[in-house]
Amino acid sequence: MQTYIATFFSHFGAIRFNKQLKELGLSGKLMPVPRRVSSSCGTCVKFEAESDTAVHSDDLEQLFLVNGEELTMLHSNI
């Protein structure tokens, strides 16, 4: 399993994404966006999945792979 952080254009998008994760049997955690990441919305979802293609959302702003303290951007809709 890989750990990811997803940012969103709106708080509602983050909540909806977290609900989608639960429906897929994945656990997500709503949390403040890390300071080193710029985002339209101040809320992100941290989650674990086998791959970044396991989930999709039209509200997704950016997707990062988490490796310890390092974040690698995988996708951006900015």
Where are the regions that the model predicts?
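A structure-centric signal for secondary-structure junctions around beta-strands
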Residues: 1-2, 60
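C-terminal structural segments of small proteins and small subunits
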Residues: 48-78
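Amphipathic, hydrophobic secondary-structure cores in small proteins
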Residues: 2-11, 17, 22-50
